[in-house]
Each structure stands twice: as structure tokens, then as C-alpha cells.
């Protein structure tokens, strides 16, 4: 590159003037020429440009570097549908408590007893698992209540609930044994109208929720085998409101009156009285609400949804007492029909029997299926869709063989008379040494 003489002379003049600190007409600072970074308010940029600024101003002042304050991390907020694991929302594994209710009468002392408090403190892992499962249940069911609408298939509803539940507890159940760490406590029940319980859609189910349906949604979620069992009913026509109100009142009555040393037969009387004080007018006809007599609430054991004690929905002579440490599913079912169910329909619910005798299985497909059931579900109830998820194929023959052999129990749907309507509400309660904790209680019910 060549430079002519006038141009060279001009450059020498500029250089000489710049060395003497003189202002040059038409010259600009680096900042004015846009040579600073766009984020020129950062402390690092100020520090880098300090010498140049000092030279321009003819000063020797130094600017101190200011350290940036680290930005505070914003707490994570749950997505819609729920997908962020609870371990990220509650990093200290301290999950919300359920509703704590002090015991009454002769058990009132338990609230302040040092001995009982000590026993309570020994249950920290037990309570943490239960509260995590309960928080997952609340978040999933509240999302479901906002989003279940007529026109959806039962398969869409079930898969949405179960996928969200698995994400929240951080275990998708696709690897061997993963669903035993945490996951579904039983198949999601989606029971329409006269179907009382134990129906979950099998693969290929085409049933669509209609505007005039009454839908019972029964969800179980477990962490470490601690199953939270809670249910609600949805209806989209206000003519069913009294049916839902009756059953919700009955369940809340059962929850309120339950406690250590309470006899279950007496508790059933309180439940029946609350429920059967209602009636419901449907299409111009008034129906008394009846408690379903041949169904019961139940205790919950680790990895087993049905324990050894039952809570009837009607008054009975059962003198069994509720005891410290018991976990109960207080559920009630009300009906506009006869108040009794019969079994019938396509089976979806199954469970490995804990008391089943070992037998030599001659059918090879039954042997391999039994191994998969033990490793993935143990005694937690499962459905056909869950077998599909873990890659089991052509298993129906082997499954039926296990049922006939008494190794696996099947649970057919429970049905009231055709043309009737039924509703369900349910909570899980812990009879802790110091208080009764309604572990599944939420703002919704």
C-alpha cells in the first residue's frame, strides 16, 4: 500500500496534536464512535476503558472495579400439565403437611405428650414419603379437574394423569423395578355413571366422556410403597350437584369422626346418616341418595392398597377399633339406585396375591409374565396398559392362567343398576401418635 505526501503530512500533524492532548476538530471518542460494547454499563467494560477515558480527560484517576452481585435464582414453578419432579420444587425433601387434626376426648393428651412426639419423630422417612406422594396427588388431580372435559377419550384422560404422576415422582417405570421406587399406586379409575369402581381403560378403548356423564376419578400414587389413595367426582350438568354434595359430605364426616379407638361399625353409622340425608332430582324425578352397602373403606399397607381393616358406609356391629399407626382410605360411594353393586364387564385391574402359594406353572408364558409382574409391580395393582408399557406382548393367555391359578387376583368393574348414577369421594388419613393427618387434603376437597 502507498501513501502520498499530503496525506502523510496530515497524519503527522494529527499524531503530534494528539500527543500534546489537543482537541482535534471532527475527532470523536471511541464511545461516540460506537466502539464500546452494547452492554457498556457493565463493570468489566468500565474497567477496560478506564485508561482511555483518563487519557482523553488528561487525568490519572482510577476507577475501582465493582463486583457484580450474583442474581438470585428464581424458584421453579410447576408446568401445565405438571412435569417438573417434586424433588426440584422441594430440594430439601420437605413436603407440605396434610391437614393436621387434634384427637378428641380421652386421646386429647396425645397432642402434647412428649412420649408421643418422640414416636412421631421416629416416623420421619415414613412421613416424607407419604407427603411427597400426597403433593404429587394434589398437583396431578388439580390439573385433571381443570382440564377434563366432555369430548375427551378415557384413554387420553388416564394417560395424562399417569404420565404427569410419574414425572412428578421422578420414576417413569420403564426400567425393571423402577415403578417400585415410586409411581402409580394402582391403575387410575375412570368410572362413568352406574360403574362404581375398578374400571380403567384398556388399550384400544374408544369411550368418550359425554356432557351428561358423572365421572369418578380414583387416583393412587406411591413413594416407597406408601400409597396415597384419593378420589373425586366430576359432573358437567348441575342436576347432579346434590349427588356429589351428599357423597362429599359423607366422606368429610367419616374423616372428621375417624380416630384412634373409634369403632368402625359406629363410624359407618355417621357416614350413612350424612349421605342419606340428601336427595337428588334428575330429569324431573327425585331420588334418595343411598350409601352403597357392600363396599367399604380400608386400611392401606406398604405396597398393598387393601389392608386388613374395613370401614363400612352403613352402621354395623363391627367392633374393630382404629389404632395408632393405622393408615386408612376413608372413601364413600353414593347411588341413586339400589345401593348395591354387582361385578361384571371387561377386566382391567389385577394384583399379585401376597398370600399365593407357589405352584409349578406349566405354561411358559405364565412363568415369564409372573417374573415381570414380581419385578415391576410386586403386590401393587396394575392394569393391561402397564404391561404394554414395559414391553409385554401376547400376555393375555398367561395372565388368565395366573388368575385361574390363584396367583394373580382380578378385579372386575363394580356396577350399580343400568340407568343409575353413582359418586365417590375419598381421602387417605394417617393416625399418627400425636395427631390425625388427612394427608391427601387439598384446596379442592
Swiss-Prot record:
Residues 60-75 have a biased composition (Basic residues). One of its GO terms (cellular component) is cytoplasm. A divalent metal cation 1 binds at residues 218, 229, 426. InterPro entries: Creatinase/aminopeptidase-like (IPR036005), Met_Aminopeptidase_Type2 (IPR050247), Pept_M24 (IPR000994), Pept_M24_MAP (IPR001714), Pept_M24A_MAP2 (IPR002468), WH-like_DNA-bd_sf (IPR036388), WH_DNA-bd_sf (IPR036390). Residues 97-115 have a biased composition (Basic and acidic residues). It comes from the Eukaryota. Substrate binds at residues 198, 306. Residues 85-95 have a biased composition (Polar residues). It is found in: Cytoplasm. GO terms for molecular function: initiator methionyl aminopeptidase activity; metal ion binding; metalloaminopeptidase activity. Keywords: Aminopeptidase, Cytoplasm, Hydrolase, Metal-binding, Protease. It holds the Pfam family Peptidase_M24. Its EC number is 3.4.11.18. The keyword Protein transport does not apply. Binds 2 divalent metal cations per subunit. Has a high-affinity and a low affinity metal-binding site. The true nature of the physiological cofactor is under debate. The enzyme is active with cobalt, zinc, manganese or divalent iron ions. Most likely, methionine aminopeptidases function as mononuclear Fe(2+)-metalloproteases under physiological conditions, and the catalytically relevant metal-binding site has been assigned to the histidine-containing high-affinity site. GO terms for biological process: proteolysis. Residues 14-115 are annotated as: Disordered. A divalent metal cation 2 binds at residues 229, 298, 331, 426. Its main location: cytoplasm. Its cofactor is Co(2+); Zn(2+); Mn(2+); Fe(2+). Residues 38-47 have a biased composition (Acidic residues). It catalyses: Release of N-terminal amino acids, preferentially methionine, from peptides and arylamides. Belongs to the peptidase M24A family. Methionine aminopeptidase eukaryotic type 2 subfamily. Cotranslationally removes the N-terminal methionine from nascent proteins. The N-terminal methionine is often cleaved when the second residue in the primary sequence is small and uncharged (Met-Ala-, Cys, Gly, Pro, Ser, Thr, or Val). PANTHER family: METHIONINE AMINOPEPTIDASE 2. This is Methionine aminopeptidase 2-3. It comes from Neosartorya fischeri (strain ATCC 1020 / DSM 3700 / CBS 544.65 / FGSC A1164 / JCM 1740 / NRRL 181 / WB 181).
Amino acid at each position: 500500500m502507498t501513501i502520498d505526501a499530503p496525506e502523510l503530512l496530515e497524519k503527522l500533524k494529527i499524531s503530534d496534536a494528539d500527543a500534546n492532548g489537543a482537541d482535534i476538530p471532527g475527532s470523536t471518542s471511541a464511545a461516540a464512535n460506537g466502539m464500546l460494547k452494547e452492554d457498556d454499563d457493565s463493570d468489566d467494560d468500565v474497567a477496560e476503558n478506564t485508561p482511555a477515558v483518563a487519557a482523553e480527560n488528561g487525568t490519572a484517576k482510577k476507577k475501582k472495579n465493582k463486583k457484580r452481585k450474583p442474581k438470585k435464582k428464581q424458584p421453579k414453578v410447576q408446568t401445565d400439565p405438571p412435569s417438573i419432579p417434586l424433588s426440584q420444587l422441594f430440594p430439601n425433601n420437605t413436603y407440605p403437611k396434610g391437614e393436621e387434626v387434634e384427637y378428641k376426648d380421652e386421646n386429647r393428651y396425645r397432642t402434647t405428650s412428649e412420649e408421643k412426639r418422640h414416636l412421631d419423630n421416629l416416623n420421619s422417612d415414613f412421613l416424607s414419603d407419604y407427603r411427597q406422594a400426597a403433593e404429587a396427588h394434589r398437583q396431578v388431580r388439580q390439573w385433571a379437574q381443570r382440564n377434563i372435559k366432555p369430548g375427551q377419550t378415557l384413554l387420553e384422560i388416564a394417560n395424562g394423569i399417569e404420565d404427569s404422576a410419574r414425572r412428578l415422582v421422578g420414576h417413569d417405570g420403564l426400567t425393571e423395578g423402577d415403578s417400585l421406587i415410586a409411581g402409580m399406586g394402582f391403575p387410575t379409575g375412570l368410572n362413568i355413571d352406574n360403574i362404581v369402581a375398578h374400571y380403567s381403560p384398556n388399550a384400544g378403548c374408544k369411550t368418550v366422556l359425554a356432557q351428561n356423564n358423572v365421572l369418578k376419578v380414583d387416583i393412587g400414587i406411591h413413594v416407597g410403597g406408601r400409597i396415597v389413595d384419593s378420589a373425586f367426582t366430576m359432573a358437567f350438568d348441575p342436576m347432579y350437584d346434590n349427588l356429589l354434595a351428599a357423597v362429599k359430605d359423607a366422606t368429610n364426616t367419616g374423616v372428621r369422626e375417624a380416630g384412634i379407638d373409634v369403632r368402625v361399625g359406629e363410624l359407618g353409622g355417621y357416614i350413612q346418616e350424612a349421605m342419606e340425608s340428601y336427595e337428588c332430582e334428575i330429569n324431573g324425578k327425585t331420588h334418595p341418595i343411598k350409601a352403597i352397602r357392600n363396599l367399604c373403606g380400608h386400611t392401606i399397607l406398604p405396597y398393598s392398597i387393601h389392608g386388613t381393616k374395613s370401614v363400612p358406609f352403613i352402621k354395623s356391629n363391627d367392633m374393630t377399633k382404629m389404632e395408632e399407626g393405622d393408615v386408612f382410605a376413608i372413601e364413600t360411594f353414593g347411588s341413586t339406585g339400589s345401593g348395591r353393586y354387582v361385578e361384571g364387564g371387561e377386566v382391567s385391574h389385577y394384583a399379585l396375591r401376597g398370600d399365593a402359594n407357589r405352584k409349578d406353572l406349566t405354561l411358559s408364558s405364565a412363568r415369564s409374565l409372573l417374573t415381570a409382574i414380581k419385578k415391576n409391580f410386586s403386590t401393587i395393582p396394575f392394569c393391561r396398559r402397564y404391561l404394554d408399557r414395559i414391553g409385554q406382548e401376547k400376555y393375555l393367555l398367561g395372565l388368565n392362567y395366573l388368575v385361574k391359578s390363584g396367583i394373580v387376583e382380578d378385579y372386575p368393574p363394580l356396577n350399580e343398576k343400568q340407568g343409575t348414577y353413582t359418586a365417590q369421594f375419598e381421602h387417605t388419613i394417617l393416625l399418627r401418635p400425636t395427631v390425625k393427618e388427612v394427608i391427601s387434603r387439598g384446596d379442592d376437597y
